[in-house]
């Protein structure tokens, strides 16, 4: 499979504009440098995989990247693979999530026929337990659908030729502290960073290696 940049949006696509993105009730904090870098990469590769440990913020970052670039695509489809346990069913589950009818038990073919030359961004979230199946489906779709781009999240890369794998870094000290404070305020609205507690907050974030989920869980215990 050859490497090429995603094409410009097409107005002739029959696959109408829909942005099926998850809704988060908390504010996205920081990651300005990461968003800038990923904005460059998503415009230069057709398969971008965000990798990293659980809780590192892959899903949230993917959501923000997709939302920021919604105008590039006729459609954005988001598929959470976490509930899928059978690798054989991945094509059917993806088709179902995208509201594409399973045509005679051939879900992969139905995906190809429906997406066709649509300018689409497909987000495959939580691929790690289905890496081989996700890689096979992604490669099949990319080969058959020339205007399709895929943004994946996984604890490990899919291993497809021309894939760009990008390791999500931990939050920096200031961003980690800001996240802690905002999440702590959900349970204790009066909480704020002060000269008295700032050292302790930063120490907690450092001990948690800047992992967003771990910081959020710790902040939720503030009373």
Please provide the spans of the model-predicted regions.
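Aliphatic-rich helical/repeat scaffold segments used for oligomerization and domain docking
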Residues: 1-223
């Amino acid at each position: 499979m050859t490497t090429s940049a995603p094409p410009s949006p097409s107005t002739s696509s029959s696959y109408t504009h829909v942005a099926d993105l998850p809704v988060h009730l908390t504010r996205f904090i920081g990651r300005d440098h990461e968003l800038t870098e990923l904005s460059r990469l998503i415009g230069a590769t057709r398969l971008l995989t965000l990798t990293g440990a659980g809780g590192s913020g892959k899903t949230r970052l993917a959501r923000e990247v997709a939302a920021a670039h919604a105008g590039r695509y006729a459609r954005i489809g988001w598929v959470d693979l976490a509930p899928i346990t059978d690798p054989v069913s991945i094509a059917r589950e993806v088709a179902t999530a995208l509201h594409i009818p399973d045509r005679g038990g051939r879900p992969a073919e139905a995906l190809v026929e429906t997406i066709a030359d649509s300018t689409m961004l497909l987000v495959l979230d939580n691929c790690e337990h289905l890496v081989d199946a996700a890689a096979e489906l992604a490669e099949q779709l990319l080969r058959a659908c020339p205007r399709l781009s895929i943004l994946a999240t996984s604890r490990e890369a899919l291993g497809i030729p021309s894939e760009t794998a990008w390791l999500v870094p931990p939050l920096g000290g200031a961003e980690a502290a800001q996240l802690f404070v905002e999440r702590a305020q959900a349970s204790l609205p009066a909480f704020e960073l002060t000269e008295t507690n700032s050292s302790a907050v930063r120490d907690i974030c450092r001990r948690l290696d800047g992992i967003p989920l771990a910081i959020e869980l710790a902040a939720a215990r503030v009373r």
